[in-house]
Structures are given as C-alpha cells and as structure tokens.
Amino acid sequence: MASSVISSAAVATRTNVTQAGSMIAPFTGLKSAATFPVSRKQNLDITSIASNGGRVRCMQVWPPINMKKYETLSYLPDLTDEQLLKEVEYLLKNGWVPCLEFETEHGFVYRENHKSPGYYDGRYWTMWKLPMFGCTDATQVLAEVQECKKSYPQAWIRIIGFDNVRQVQCISFIAYKPEGY
C-alpha cells in the first residue's frame, strides 16, 4: 500500500498595530473599595434589622379557639350557592367524578383513638349514595347536596372531586355546615 505524507508549515507573524482607536486598556482587576461610598449603620439595635419599612402589613393568623379548619377553602366564609355551583363546574370541567360525603359528629380532623403525629380521626366520612359517574350538570350535584341536607340537617357535607384515571382525590371542600359552626 502506498502512503503519502503531506507536510505543511505555517508561519505566524506578529504585527504591532499602533493605532490609538483600537487600543483597549488591559484588565487590572476589581476596583478598590475606596472608590465606592460607604455608609454603615451605627445603630447596633437588633430590632432595626427586621424592619420592612412599613410597606407590608402583618396578616392575622388563624385563631385556634372555636375556629375549626375543615377542608379546602375553609379559611373563607361559607360558600354561597353560586360559588358552590362554580366550584362544581370547575370539578366537572377537569373531568373529575363528584362524590358527596357527610359526617354527623365531627366535621373536622381530631385525635381520639391514637396520639401519633401522622394519625387523625375524622378523615373518613360516610358516602352519600354512590359517586356520580357520568354527571355533567353541576345543578344535579347541588340537588344531591340539598337532599342530603334534608336527611341530615345536623351533618357536615363535603363535595369531593375524584380522578378515576389516577385514582386520587383531587379536590374536597365543605358544601354545608350545621348551625353554630
């Protein structure tokens, strides 16, 4: 087999361009701190560190006495029928199956049978009828809420949106609370 070797030599030459317009000053590092004005606080009071300038007002936290927290949206006032209708329409628009549950004694989570941190009683409620598979009308769901309310006037009623593909509960909110809660 024949092989060939090709050699080429390149010669680099340096030319000094001494035009004043193309000269760039060399990088000499960061500027010294002496060129910047320095203003230091002389007040060593620790309370002055946490000041937000009065621009933000503090928010009130949830009062723990006689104000039970239930489900999603429980920090808001009770939902009106129009607001419930919009929530159920949102639930149906996402393709979730509406389901009604009710609880006659405790409408909130509590600890009675076990004291470990991850365990709560009151998470599981009684289902009202069967889940409403195939339901496309939000007024039909609210009619079931009214029927449940007539049967159990002293019960908490919640609406759940269940995703039957992923098999998870996607939304849950209180639709009715008894008087005094």
UniProtKB/Swiss-Prot annotation:
Residues 1-57 form a transit peptide. It comes from the Eukaryota. It comes from Solanum tuberosum (Potato). InterPro entries: RuBisCO_ssu (IPR024681), RuBisCO_ssu_dom (IPR000894), RuBisCO_ssu_N (IPR024680), RuBisCO_ssu_sf (IPR036385). This is Ribulose bisphosphate carboxylase small subunit, chloroplastic 2. Belongs to the RuBisCO small chain family. It holds the Pfam family RuBisCO_small. GO terms for cellular component: chloroplast. PANTHER family: RIBULOSE BISPHOSPHATE CARBOXYLASE SMALL CHAIN 1, CHLOROPLASTIC, RIBULOSE BISPHOSPHATE CARBOXYLASE SMALL SUBUNIT 1A, CHLOROPLASTIC-RELATED. GO terms for biological process: photorespiration; reductive pentose-phosphate cycle. The keyword Membrane does not apply. Its main location: plastid. GO terms for molecular function: ribulose-bisphosphate carboxylase activity. The basic functional RuBisCO is composed of a large chain homodimer in a 'head-to-tail' conformation. In form I RuBisCO this homodimer is arranged in a barrel-like tetramer with the small subunits forming a tetrameric 'cap' on each end of the 'barrel'. Heterohexadecamer of 8 large and 8 small subunits. The keyword Glycoprotein does not apply. CDD domains: RuBisCO_small. It is found in: Plastid, Chloroplast. Keywords: Calvin cycle, Carbon dioxide fixation, Chloroplast, Photorespiration, Photosynthesis, Plastid, Transit peptide. RuBisCO catalyzes two reactions: the carboxylation of D-ribulose 1,5-bisphosphate, the primary event in carbon dioxide fixation, as well as the oxidative fragmentation of the pentose substrate. Both reactions occur simultaneously and in competition at the same active site. Although the small subunit is not catalytic it is essential for maximal activity. The lineage of its organism: Eukaryota, Viridiplantae, Streptophyta, Embryophyta, Tracheophyta. SUPFAM superfamilies: RuBisCO, small subunit.
